[in-house]
Amino acid sequence: MLGASSFLYLFWDGKSGKARSPQQPRVRVLFCHALNTGVPSSHSPREQSAVGEFQRQEDAFREWISNDGSTSYPAAVGRYHLYVSLACPWASRTVVFRKLKGLENAIGLTIVDPFRDEKGWAFRDPERTKPGSSLKDLDKFESTDPINRFRYLSEAYQATDPNFKERVTVPVLWDKETKRIVNNCEDDICPMFNFAFNEFASNKDVDLFPKEIEVEHNKLSDFIYENINNGVYRAGFATRQQAYERACKRLFDALDEMEKRLTESRYLFGKRIVEADWRLFCTLIRFDVVYHGHFKCNLRRIIDYPNLHGYLLDLYQQPGIAETVSIDHIKRHYYMTHEEINPTRIVPLGPIVDLTKPHGRETL
């Protein structure tokens, strides 16, 4: 099993076991924190090293959807459904891609309750778990899943593989025809939305994986994942002081590098927004409201970085993106779910963030 510090520089088709086109992503260790029944509330003990470092498990389902008949899953309107949490940075990237490509009429979407107890992600009305609410009898609810009437996302995993025993994660791309999970890896789902579903997209000209910068883009995307996306979790879930300090230093060294890169460039690759920008965005949007305090990533805030902060505002203000972000879900999930980090489950009122003020990056 690959640990959190490992990734493979190869292209791989999870169905055929053959090398993929370079347009399709590398296999990487990417997972959002979600649970199967009986697994501790944040992550499995198997994901903690002997020296207190957090190490992610591997993705479970890696089938591929194609538009050329090369796989068992053809791209089609209305066949696939996306299950996500708006709290999860990994799942949120798929929601962003669905919005940017204009795939709302092609791919359905269901959002789980941001609060996750020992039974895992639930298809429950989020009003039941607002801060300060009683968390008793949470298993008494009507499902909000319009497709299968699942009560818990774990049911989708069990329907796909009855022997599945690992953590249940978001995002999940569900096939309504075969009644199984096609893929639960956002690093696969995003390029599938970009390429395989392009004929059904209302924004066909939006290409978030431009071929001409593929090598450099993939290298930077890996850097952001390894040091920033996963870096906040390495700091937040460290169980030894030394492991925490190493993770925190590595994270802020990477943020400093991104701040420098954005000094003379509006986006990571000039004036064009690509996948790596949205990968970084999904961590930045959560940083000051949860990672800075909850995960002790507190050397600096994003608002303390002039370029990164302006860049965050710029991306947030792109058409449709604000609809994909829920600060409420983000704060409720982290502060109420990670009981071992926040035993009182009190959700802080702040910080106050203004994501609509001028970003000042138009001249770059």
Label each residue range with its predicted role.
Residues L2-L364:
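C-terminal alpha-helical interaction module
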